[in-house]
Every structure is written in C-alpha cells, then in structure tokens.
C-alpha cells in the first residue's frame, strides 16, 4: 500500500494538521524542511517534533496516544528516595545543557543515535534562546545523569534523558517534576510510551486530549525563576521535599 506523506517546503514554516498523521508508523506526519529554529519552535507549538535515523530524511511526528507525566502527581519509588538519602546526588537546572544533550546522544548505540550533529546544534541554539532546558544529576563533580526538553508555557516537552549511574535519570525526573509543579508547570510530554516510562508512572493522552492541553498550557507561563540556573539538591539538602 502506498503511503502519502507531506513534504515540507523550505520556503515556509507551515505544517499539516497533527490530526492527519499516519497510524502506521504511529504519528508520522511529514518529511523534509530543515532544522531552522523557527521551524522547530513552530513544530513544538503544534505538538509536533523531529525524529529521524541516520539514513532518513528529516521526519516530523505527532503520535497518538501521547505519553505524559502529570508533575503534580509524580511519586518516585521508595527505593529511589532511600537511594538519594544515602548517596546525596546533586541536582541542578541549566548548569550543563550542552553536556546533557551530548550524553543523551553518546549513551545510545551508534545506529540508534537520532541526536545527530544538526539536532544537537539546534537544541543548543534553542537553549541560548531560553527555550531548551536541562536538569543535571551530579555525583561529586561528575555529570552522571540528566534530561532535557523544550518549554512551551506550562508544558514541558521532554526530549531525552540519560543515566551513567544508578537511579540518576530517575532522580532527575523526580526533582524536575517537583520543581516544575511548584512553578505551576502542568504537564510533561514524553512523546511515545515505552516500558521504562510506564514503570515510572507515565500515562497516555489521545492526540485530541494532548492538543487540547497544549493549546491551553502554551498560553500560560510558569512562575518566574523556574528555568534560572540553580541547584535543586546539594549534600546539605538532598531531599528537601521528602514526605
């Protein structure tokens, strides 16, 4: 069966409606265009994101169902809380965004690295614009885990995470959910559900539900200071929001 897919024009930033995305492969919406910051930003504003393999053209996606976290309801496993009390990883926001993006690429097998040089450069430039943010987890002075994504009002579009030490990415997500919700963040987009996300408590929204949430949350801002460079946990206060 032939698949008809929209090719994006390099001359405009227009995307087809997310509701025209394919069912198989789930969410594939368009191909082509470029990775101009204006295009990427326009995509996230519509619930669309780029993802493509080493041999692919630029592909644009809007899957359904959509994996999400409600940061106000996120609860880490008791074992993770116990681990953090003992090991006292440090957790920061926007201290090493470029390093986090690089590690998210390097910790995957070469044939699965969708975060190529062009993508890493684009997200790095979005960070300079204050649109891409990271959470870092440190063991001493070593970066051992983290996550990064794009902020769209009260919605955070999580892009990738990595872990080089036990529980590091789980601790990054835990502290970020608490921090984001305290600053009136409402939803964290995780794109496509997988067993790991499900084990962490992710749920799903239909495309219609996700787009409705996006339209509402993107017009509202998180509280001032949410994405300032800061520490969320240090050895003197590693679990300030424990039960």
UniProtKB/Swiss-Prot annotation:
InterPro entries referenced in this protein's UniProt entry, alphabetically: Acyl_CoA_acyltransferase, Leu/Phe-tRNA_Trfase, Leu/Phe-tRNA_Trfase_C, Leu/Phe-tRNA_Trfase_N
Chief subcellular location: cytoplasm
Record keyword Nucleotide-binding present: no
Gene Ontology BP term (one): protein catabolic process
Example of a GO MF term: leucyl-tRNA--protein transferase activity
Keyword Zinc: no
Entry's localization field: Cytoplasm
EC number, as in UniProt: 2.3.2.6
Keywords: Acyltransferase, Cytoplasm, Transferase
Positions of disulphide bridges: none
Class of this enzyme: transferase
GO cellular component term, pick one: cytoplasm
Reactions that this protein is recorded to catalyse: N-terminal L-lysyl-[protein] + L-leucyl-tRNA(Leu) = N-terminal L-leucyl-L-lysyl-[protein] + tRNA(Leu) + H(+); N-terminal L-arginyl-[protein] + L-leucyl-tRNA(Leu) = N-terminal L-leucyl-L-arginyl-[protein] + tRNA(Leu) + H(+); L-phenylalanyl-tRNA(Phe) + an N-terminal L-alpha-aminoacyl-[protein] = an N-terminal L-phenylalanyl-L-alpha-aminoacyl-[protein] + tRNA(Phe)
Family per similarity comment: Belongs to the L/F-transferase family.
Function: Functions in the N-end rule pathway of protein degradation where it conjugates Leu, Phe and, less efficiently, Met from aminoacyl-tRNAs to the N-termini of proteins containing an N-terminal arginine or lysine.
Name under which the protein is recorded: Leucyl/phenylalanyl-tRNA--protein transferase
Organism whose genome encodes this protein: Vibrio cholerae serotype O1 (strain ATCC 39315 / El Tor Inaba N16961)
């Amino acid at each position: 069966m032939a698949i008809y897919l929209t090719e994006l024009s390099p001359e405009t930033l227009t995307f087809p409606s997310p509701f025209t995305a394919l069912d198989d492969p789930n969410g594939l919406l368009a191909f082509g265009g470029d990775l101009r910051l204006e295009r990427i930003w326009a995509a996230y504003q519509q619930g669309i994101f780029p993802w493509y393999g080493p041999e692919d053209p630029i592909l644009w996606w809007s899957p359904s169902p959509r994996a999400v976290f409600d940061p106000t309801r996120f609860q880490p496993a008791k074992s993770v809380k116990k681990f953090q009390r003992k090991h006292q990883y440090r957790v920061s926001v926007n201290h090493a965004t470029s390093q986090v993006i690089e590690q998210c690429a390097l910790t995957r097998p070469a044939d699965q690295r969708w975060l190529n040089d062009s993508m890493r450069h684009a997200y790095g430039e979005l960070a300079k614009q204050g649109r891409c943010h990271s959470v870092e987890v440190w063991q001493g002075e070593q970066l051992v885990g983290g996550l990064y994504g794009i902020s769209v009002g009260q919605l955070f579009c999580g892009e990738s995470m990595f872990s080089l030490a036990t529980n590091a990415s789980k601790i990054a997500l835990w502290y970020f959910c608490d921090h984001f919700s305290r600053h009136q963040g409402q939803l964290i987009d995780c794109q496509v559900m997988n067993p790991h996300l499900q084990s962490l408590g992710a749920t799903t929204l239909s495309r219609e539900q996700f787009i409705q949430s996006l339209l509402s949350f993107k017009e509202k801002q998180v509280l001032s200071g949410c994405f300032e460079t800061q520490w969320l946990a240090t050895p003197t206060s590693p679990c300030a929001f424990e039960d």
